[in-house]
């Protein structure tokens, strides 16, 4: 503003102050005047007064609507409830009166005031007086203030004029736009009618300012004119009045106050508002004129007065009170809400109510009052407090909206805010920021701004914003206050200054809330800008010029300004239009639903265009909110006041306009606005552009955005913008960028952060508004987008806010926007919020408001490099989403220390395939789900200390890969009492376990000692360690591998040891465990007590720079050989994929190894077939030679790009000799062809010998040659490694699996007890003899090897020694050779030959034969059945392992690291490629997990490793993957061997497996082995033999018993016969015997049992026997009856007869 304008403003303020008492009198005059015009209508329906928008263009139109322009004394308007609703806004309507006229009127007012010489009442006095007047006067009495009094009282006149103008504007918002200037003149007319002489005269006196004021007012009015706006204006006017008064008035009569307020406030509002408006208008007479349109905007302040006019006295009082007692704002705000409710009853109030529901939406709609009512029940209350707002409310609904923007009176109060809002809410806001800052500088000239701050008193802003439904109330209040401070500038410069400085900062600080409001007011700012040009002229004189342009366009811009303010308010008041026009501000800017919206777009074309630009910048106003943080530096308070004024939406808009300072900022913002808009995306830029740009962004969010803004404010104005974006689809999109923007506008965030607490509160409102506005945002968004660069920035800002928004605001934003968007936005600015560099993302030491609540997800292409270290220590992360790690696939170290994690799930770390270091200490983790660590196959370190873990349930450390690399685990400082996870004890590589400060029992220690055989250091709780120390000597004597380190505390501790009985007993379980460990492993275990001050954190000093996993070339070759077959299986060019990476792992060792490899190619061939000792010696020699050449070797990293190109001339030349010589030496053996190639290049490499050793070349050509040769050397070395690996693959196929298995046992200490078992050696002859059994065994092992080695990989051989290349040890024969070969061929030699052929063919074609694959697959099934549950068993174990892995997959949703990492987006070409690979490898790799891992690695190498920055990482991935496959294969073979030869041991080792399927398969496998393996079921057979023998024995015994029984019976019969001839048996007996012998049945020749057996069967014998008995009996008779002398003869005859 020019210095002339500033004095004018000062005069106006002083006069307003003087008119302090006048409001009491003037309101009566005004009331009488109104009564004359429409005594009944006015009383009954203030809207009717307002409804007569005869000249919507005229800022006084609303007034004239009440009092026809032609007859100033006839304020009667068509009895239109709608108009009446805008009667409150009618003040705003009047405000919108043409800037000239309103300026003139303002000038008269100022003059009158000055002439009166009266000084404004003190805030308390004024409030009291207004209150008394209100109480004494009825609404009718209040309303009819005579024009004379108005003349006398500039405040009253202003209010009347505003009321009249507003009425018109309300009646025809569009007309308002068209006739902004006309309104201005019309305003003069109605004023002349109402207060013709003085008012006009006074307008004439300061024509320049008046005109400016008029236009700016008019602009505000047009927006204010919107029905909704009008109601809002009414409520706002009430609020404005009520700031001080409303607390009382509203409390006394909240609803009636609304109606009365227009009448009562006229005086006070005219005083208060008029002063601000006049001041605004008058101060920038020149500028206002220059900003002719701005003056129109300024006129809005007049409109605000008009709003007051609706209840002028009350408003005036309240506004004065507001100004004086901004703290009362909150009270007023609440009453104002009631007021709004009252207006809601009329059509306009309903619209306001809607507004409150959807401020942003409402502004678009004509019914702004409802919007305001809803959005700003509080806002309106706040507006009620600010007379300006009240005036705005008075303006007719349509006009009121237009007026609202136009209604400078409202804007006047928060000129700064208006500035922010007015210019283009966006632009203005941004400008406003600058302007505010300028205003701050111009605090003298911009006392208005300061006074507004004072009016707000800093506190009022907050109350208002809170009532505004957040920030809006504050905004209105701020806006209103700004005007008053302008008015009060003269009366109480100190107060104004204090308020301006503090309030502005306070308002800024207070609010972000105000900030939000400011966005709403930003539209108003344009109007205010005109009014405030004086203030902001300094602040933004340059800006003001833009504002002038804007104002020139302002006529439209008025509407837009209103819209802009409305938009800003829209979030609060008229979301509809606001959203459409300014995204946020536009919506607000369009208080009149249709008109404003149209205007807003139009405004962009007219002043609105500038304003639109401004509006576009308005998003920056949103930024401005962010700026509001800066606003402290800048005159944020003005913005805030403006924002506060927008409280009613329209009022807010008016206030924005009213705020002259704001208007200037609007100009400035406007000027900046284009930039702001452009910069808006870079909210930071906005802030940089001029605080306004940034602020404008903030402003955009006023209602919703304001809230977002607020939260964002803290961060940067961005958030408000975000809200707006949220409303706007586009903003949402930008939201993602916004994080970056936010980071860009780090300053705003800081300011915002400071403000955030308030913004958070506002954010809530704004969130609601945003939601409500969301529909409008589409329209507004459209406009915004058109205007829109601002929109872009808002989005960016929003993301920034979100990212910063670790605050509630962020959460709300997130809720409003899609969570993904929110994340995206957060990630977008992640490098602004956090530190990005050196492959590290560090988000530590953030402010509490900025701390992360979720893992940030960076947008693609936001960071050129990769992050290998993520440090999120000290944030608020409480949950980890499933797919959050997709963007960090190369991360190796993750620190989540000191967050709020409570539980870990199986998908918590999906996607971190390369992770090695995981720090989860000092969280609140209570539970860990099964398979949680399964996605981390290469994890080495886990820190779970300082949590609340009470138990480790089964499967916590379960994973299909067995966690082969985990060697450090920290569990200390947990209330851990139970460890039920056997997988923990079985971790194969665990070397360090810290369980200090836990409650683990002695049983856990026993399990550790028994099963964790590789453990080297164990930290125990002090009580347990001290207990063991009491028996230190005994323990160390029993198990020499266990060492106890006891500290002094333990040695002196005499505490009773609960475990003493168990530990001290030599025959107890503990000692037996120690003995078993002694026999089981030779690894030395050190047991230590916990350290009292132990932080439990292990620092891996060399973690970031650790070398590749394989430090020996031979080891690298052996690991590489485990993955080469898979590359070949899928027809990939191995050289092109691996050559760029192969050199990397070995460059540290020395490229000179190439020579050794080449020279010893043949030797390697022999060594592979020879004993292991030879092999070891060979590789030791190779190592020594390579070490000698290390000094001369140059790193090949620099030549990585060249080496990648296999087609380079040097590589081709190198390859040709190889191709030629290979056939010669190997006679077509493809496997050795490549080795020969290496030899071919030996010469070339040897040429480099001197150079590599360090011998300098004397000639420059010689120097060049070494460089070229170095490249050749690197490439040759890589190729030689590939060939070596392939040769290893081929040679290992012929190796004997038996030896390999044996070696495996030797390698694994834990399996040492199995080392001595070599049954296969004995079994081999049998296998050869029995082809069937041999085929079965070989087939089983082959499938296993194929599955475990992942197809034809020499995994078994390589794994046997973890670095040895001996093919003998590698059972690759089984792996690569088709099963059919083993089955068909009984001869091992024949099989071997065929295998070799197969292998050669495989190497040649890089593909396994179909038959082989199918065979392997077929035979894998039996193995699967045999699998015993461990993941790494040979042969039968393979199946089991596969089964188990599959089961685990089910547990993890079948998503191993690769799957979860790669499959989220199936549409991705990489994902499609990986799926295809998985399908191709299915036949080769039955296990799903292993197959996915290999597919993912291949996909990564092919598609994600092209960048130079990931070369080393990719090389590490290749090495680790090969090493993992090697370990898995070795373990599988060991398991399989155990299953084959030790069933009991096999069962023990597999007790961990819970799977029912696995158990059933194990049983089936055991049965198969029993049937197929000779001797496997010997015990069973022995038992069967014994059983059979027993049965046979029993049968024999039974038979014998039967025979004996029969014999005894026969003997009995013989005895009976003898007894009968007892007296004469001797001779007969001898005859009988002789007869039996004659029959061939001699008693001596045959066994008695046999003879007796046949006796019963001889019928003849029976008959003979009977005959003999008869004969004997007859002979006896003869003997008895014969004579003694004849006795011998018969005897002899008988004997002779008997003998024959």
Swiss-Prot record:
Cellular component, GO, one term: membrane
Record SUPFAM superfamilies: L domain-like
Region feature (Disordered): 54-104, 130-156, 169-534, 559-580, 619-642, 729-752, 1182-1227, 1309-1328, 1675-1700
Topology term for the membrane: Single-pass type I membrane protein
Residues making up the signal peptide according to the UniProt record: 1-35
PROSITE patterns noted in UniProt: LRR
Topology, Extracellular side: 36-1582
LRR repeat residue intervals: 137-160, 230-253, 267-290, 864-887, 888-911, 912-935, 937-959, 963-987, 1002-1027, 1124-1146
Side of membrane Cytoplasmic, spans: 1604-1700
InterPro entries in the cross-refs: Leu-rich_rpt, Leu-rich_rpt_typical-subtyp, LRR_dom_sf, LRRC37, LRRC37_N, LRRC37AB_C
Protein name stated in the entry: Leucine-rich repeat-containing protein 37A2
Gene it is expressed from: LRRC37A2
